[in-house]
């Protein structure tokens, strides 16, 4: 009984067909791997964008009203430390703090502002309340009522840290908070503060563009400042 081996032509054809199959499988695996990697990158960008928008929204909502200042690629504001109501009694400004965690005496560096209309008011028309003690059921700024520029219709006051201004900036593809990076892969960003009107409070318009691997995702969000003077 005779046996027959492969001819040279059959061997070459087998190698060619095998190589084609291997290349096809490798290309399929590479395509799947690249698709997975791209999906991971997209998910990372989306997660980062959601984190940044949520962080910005929370901080902007609870800022001192009209404490915003936008300049170019930066937006600055003052967070609220305490808030409450006040009354003018003689030459004194007496006030209550609604936050039950407020300490007495008040911490160093705190200032009180009433009815601010711009960020500069927090510097020029505020009252230093550092060290004040709640010894009569309320705090009091003594002998300062005469220099109060304007009153709040709802008798509201806001206490902030005079050295605690927060500034968000977009530079070199990054968004930073007081110099600390909070997001990268940002190709464009803008923060615009719209002053309050009779129909609404102050509004911050956020526009962000994240770019990675030649793919861009655009995000826009309006954040209303919840507090009013």
Would you name each region that the model predicts?
Residues 2, 161, 212:
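Acidic surface patches and DE-rich sequence motifs
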Residues 2-61:
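Aliphatic-rich helix starts adjacent to a transmembrane/signal segment
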Residues 4, 108, 200-202:
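Residue-level preference for short coil/turn positions at secondary-structure junctions
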Residues 6, 157, 168, 191-194:
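Aromatic-residue hotspot detector
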Residues 13, 23-25, 42-49, 134-140, ...:
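A generic short-segment signal for beta-strand/edge and adjacent turn/coil regions
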Residues 30, 61, 82, 117, ...:
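Residue-level marker of positions within ordered structural domains that often coincide
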Residues 42-170:
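Extracytoplasmic beta-strand-rich oligomerization domains located immediately C-terminal to a leader/signal peptide
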Residues 172-229:
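Short linear sequence signals and composition-biased patches located at protein termini or domain-edge surfaces
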């Amino acid at each position: 009984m005779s046996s027959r081996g492969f001819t040279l032509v059959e061997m070459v054809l087998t190698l060619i067909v095998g190589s084609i199959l291997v290349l096809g499988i490798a290309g399929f695996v590479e395509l799947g791997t690249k698709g997975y990697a791209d999906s991971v990158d997209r998910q990372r960008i989306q997660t980062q964008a959601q984190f940044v928008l949520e962080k910005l929204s929370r901080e902007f909502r609870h800022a001192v009203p009209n404490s915003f200042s936008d300049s170019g690629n930066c937006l600055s504001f003052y967070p609220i430390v305490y808030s409450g109501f006040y009354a003018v009694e003689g030459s004194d400004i007496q006030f209550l703090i609604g936050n039950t965690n407020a300490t007495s005496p008040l911490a160093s560096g705190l200032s009180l502002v009433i009815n601010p209309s711009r960020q500069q008011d927090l510097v020029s028309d505020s009252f230093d309340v550092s060290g004040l003690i709640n010894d009569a059921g309320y705090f009091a700024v003594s002998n300062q009522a005469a220099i109060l520029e304007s009153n709040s219709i709802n008798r509201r006051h806001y206490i902030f840290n005079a050295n605690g201004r927060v500034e968000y900036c977009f530079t070199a593809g990054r968004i930073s908070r007081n110099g600390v990076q909070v997001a990268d892969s940002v190709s464009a960003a803008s923060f615009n503060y719209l002053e309050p009107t009779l129909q609404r409070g102050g509004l911050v318009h956020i526009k962000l563009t994240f770019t990675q691997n030649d793919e861009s995702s655009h995000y826009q969000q309006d954040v209303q400042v919840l507090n009013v003077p």
